[in-house]
């Protein structure tokens, strides 16, 4: 039993360190889906992952003096329902920033 393209759902997962760049990418994807008459739901914000690194400030003995750095990974999900072939072509040709990681599932 095969499902036609009109009944499928495209799930797009986006990850980035910069929240503003991620939101701009989400807006571009939703705008592209709207221009090709596909319905888009999202962006749905997922929990932000924080990775904290502890580094000694001194190269020698002062272990009491430490510095903390963190990276935050912001994540979003966009679901596109009833995509057409035109929608998929437009999403493939979309120019997004290099700092945004994209995963697409059909």
Curated annotation (Swiss-Prot):
GO MF assignments: structural constituent of ribosome; tRNA binding
> Which keywords does the record carry?
Ribonucleoprotein, Ribosomal protein
Name of the protein this chain belongs to: Small ribosomal subunit protein uS10
Tell me which family the UniProt entry assigns to this protein. Belongs to the universal ribosomal protein uS10 family.
Which Gene Ontology terms of cellular component type are present? ribonucleoprotein complex; ribosome
SMART domains noted in UniProt: Ribosomal_S10
Q: What does this protein do?
A: Involved in the binding of tRNA to the ribosomes.
Q: How does it assemble?
A: Part of the 30S ribosomal subunit.
Q: Please give the PANTHER family that the UniProt record associates with this protein.
A: 30S RIBOSOMAL PROTEIN S10 FAMILY MEMBER
Listed under GO biological process in this entry are: translation
Gene3D superfamilies membership: Ribosomal protein S10 domain
Quote the gene name from the UniProt entry.
Answer: rpsJ
Q: Check the record and name the InterPro entries matching this protein.
A: Ribosomal_uS10, Ribosomal_uS10_dom, Ribosomal_uS10_dom_sf
Which residue ranges traverse the bilayer? none
One Pfam match, given by its short name, reads: Ribosomal_S10
Q: NCBIfam families recorded for this chain?
A: PRK00596.1 (NF001861), rpsJ_bact (TIGR01049)
Record keywords: Ribonucleoprotein included? yes
